Every structure is written in C-alpha cells, then in structure tokens.
C-alpha cells in the first residue's frame, strides 16, 4: 500500500512539474499601459526624432525553461504614431511615408526564437509594414515573471531592432533617415 501511495505521489509530482514546464499563453497588457513600441530616427543627420505607437496589442506563449518554443504575435495601428508634434505626425502618417490610410496596420509574427544567453534571445519573425512583409530579428531580454498584486501572473520583456525603411518601400527624407531604431517593452498577463 505504501509503495502504491509513493508511486502515486511521484507520478503526481512529475505531472505537476511537467505542467509547470509547458509554455503559458499571455496577453500583452495594453490596458494597464505596460506596453510600449518606441522608435528613433535621424533628423537630417543633426538630431533624432523620438516617437511611439500608442495603439497596439498582441499575444505570446512563453516558457522560461524552453524559450525556443516561444511565439509572439503583435498588431499595431499605424495611425497611432505620436512624436509630440502634430504637424510632423500628420506628415509621417501621409502618403510620403507610412500612408496610414492605405496601410492602417503593421504586424509582427515570430518564426523562430534562438537563445543567446541566460535571459536573452534573438526573436526572428515576419514584419508586415507599408504592405511589405520582410524578416527581421528582435534582440530580446527576459526581465522576469511572477505573481502580480491583482491575482494574475505576468512576464516582462524588452527588445530592440533596426529597420531599413527602404526594405518596406518607405523613403526617408534623406540619406541619414533610412534606418529606424525600435525599442519595445511590455508585460504580458497570463491567460486563465
């Protein structure tokens, strides 16, 4: 009888451990404002314009023990661009650049995750921007995970990437304005 009880306990513990090791699904916390897609681009080679996209959301699957099994899917509303200057925002949103009337969304879907360190990874995926889909790599950092004060469970990440705007059919205003640096930061709330 004791052997059966110990075997059942061992099996239960193994199943529980296996269940905890499975990837969990998360929703990016847009409502709590714990999600940012910021960018920086050269202005005529003299300074930088900084901006953000205010309206985006997404989901991801993550298991810290198997980061290579992670997946992320993000959609961004291009008209939510904000650079703290209304006329510039209007110009960047126009046909000259993003053409948000014709291309109202940008989308990123991961295709592979490769660990590069204890808490870092290269996230490769397809970015659709301005009607063009190209592979990009996001240098990602896992910031941590745990219970939050509201009874949920969260995981947080940062990521950076550099885009060549010509690759997406977007012409910068000059030779120094062809690359855009992305800085992404978000928390995800685990789905129940």
Curated annotation (Swiss-Prot):
Biological source species: Pseudomonas savastanoi pv. phaseolicola (strain 1448A / Race 6)
Keyword list, A-Z: Periplasm, Signal
Lineage: Bacteria, Pseudomonadati, Pseudomonadota, Gammaproteobacteria, Pseudomonadales
Domain of life: Bacteria
Cellular component aspect of the GO annotation: periplasmic space
Cleaved signal peptide residues: 1-23
Protein name in UniProt: UPF0312 protein PSPPH_0448
Iron as UniProt keyword: no
Family under the similarity heading: Belongs to the UPF0312 family. Type 1 subfamily.
Bilayer-spanning residue ranges: none
